[in-house]
Amino acid sequence: MNIFRLAGDMTHLASVLVLLLKIHTIKSCAGVSLKTQELYAIVFATRYLDIFTSFVSLYNTSMKLVFLGSSFSIVWYMKYHKAVHRTYDREQDTFRHWFLVLPCFLLALLIHEKFTFLEVLWTSSLYLEAVAILPQLVLLQRTRNIDNLTGQYIFLLGGYRGLYILNWIYRYFTEPHFVHWITWIAGFVQTLLYADFFYYYFLSWKNNKKLQLPA
């Protein structure tokens, strides 16, 4: 494992911890899209089915369990914890996220590396993760005002994807035959979706102002 992969994993983990801190400690999910969190739960559930069939390392298995457990716990908190659920902005979080799931699965049936059950589900998780942030970004544009923890959560999510791209570049030049076009394209699309948010995030940091997105 290279430093970019490790940094990407730790940044991804940090994003989850920031969100859990907000939900568990402050008892608030204001500004957080339940639709995006449900999509992430599907992403990890379909991607990590191989946890029952293959073992790579203790680190690998531990990270899979952490992301599976955290994604479903976040969804549970937002839907069923009374104090947290009261802060959920249902009226603004109206993106029809389920319409993203089937197209991603159908695309995985058509474009994949190997036509096996686990491989198709794994590929569909790549496509779905690339667009899972869309409901969250739409919600932020509607509400405009973004609290610090929500902003940090999304910034860390985008940072994790950026570090993974550096990981792929590093492995391309250091490992023979390391070519995974599906993973690369999905990751690049996902990173592009964060570009607008990053622009306004750095502007707010530079000017020492509260983060706001244009309507």
Curated annotation (Swiss-Prot):
<keyword id="KW-1133">Transmembrane helix</keyword>
<dbReference type="GO" id="GO:0005794">
    <property type="term" value="C:Golgi apparatus"/>
</dbReference>
<feature type="transmembrane region" description="Helical">
    <location>
        <begin position="55"/>
        <end position="77"/>
    </location>
</feature>
<comment type="similarity">
    <text>Belongs to the ERD2 family.</text>
</comment>
<dbReference type="GO" id="GO:0000139">
    <property type="term" value="C:Golgi membrane"/>
</dbReference>
<feature type="transmembrane region" description="Helical">
    <location>
        <begin position="6"/>
        <end position="26"/>
    </location>
</feature>
<keyword id="KW-0472">Membrane</keyword>
<dbReference type="InterPro" id="IPR000133">
    <property type="entry name" value="ER_ret_rcpt"/>
</dbReference>
<dbReference type="GO" id="GO:0046923">
    <property type="term" value="F:ER retention sequence binding"/>
</dbReference>
<feature type="transmembrane region" description="Helical">
    <location>
        <begin position="149"/>
        <end position="169"/>
    </location>
</feature>
<feature type="transmembrane region" description="Helical">
    <location>
        <begin position="178"/>
        <end position="198"/>
    </location>
</feature>
<keyword id="KW-0653">Protein transport</keyword>
<keyword id="KW-0256">Endoplasmic reticulum</keyword>
<dbReference type="GO" id="GO:0015031">
    <property type="term" value="P:protein transport"/>
</dbReference>
<feature type="transmembrane region" description="Helical">
    <location>
        <begin position="120"/>
        <end position="140"/>
    </location>
</feature>
<keyword id="KW-0675">Receptor</keyword>
<dbReference type="GO" id="GO:0005789">
    <property type="term" value="C:endoplasmic reticulum membrane"/>
</dbReference>
<keyword id="KW-0812">Transmembrane</keyword>
<feature type="transmembrane region" description="Helical">
    <location>
        <begin position="98"/>
        <end position="118"/>
    </location>
</feature>
<keyword id="KW-0333">Golgi apparatus</keyword>
<protein>
    <recommendedName>
        <fullName>ER lumen protein-retaining receptor B</fullName>
    </recommendedName>
</protein>
<keyword id="KW-0931">ER-Golgi transport</keyword>
<comment type="function">
    <text>Determines the specificity of the luminal endoplasmic reticulum protein retention system. Required for the retro-transport of calreticulin-3 (CRT3) from the Golgi to the ER. Specifically required for elongation factor Tu receptor (EFR) function in response to the pathogen-associated molecular pattern (PAMP) elf18.</text>
</comment>
<dbReference type="GO" id="GO:0006621">
    <property type="term" value="P:protein retention in ER lumen"/>
</dbReference>
<dbReference type="Pfam" id="PF00810">
    <property type="entry name" value="ER_lumen_recept"/>
</dbReference>
<dbReference type="GO" id="GO:0016192">
    <property type="term" value="P:vesicle-mediated transport"/>
</dbReference>
<keyword id="KW-0813">Transport</keyword>
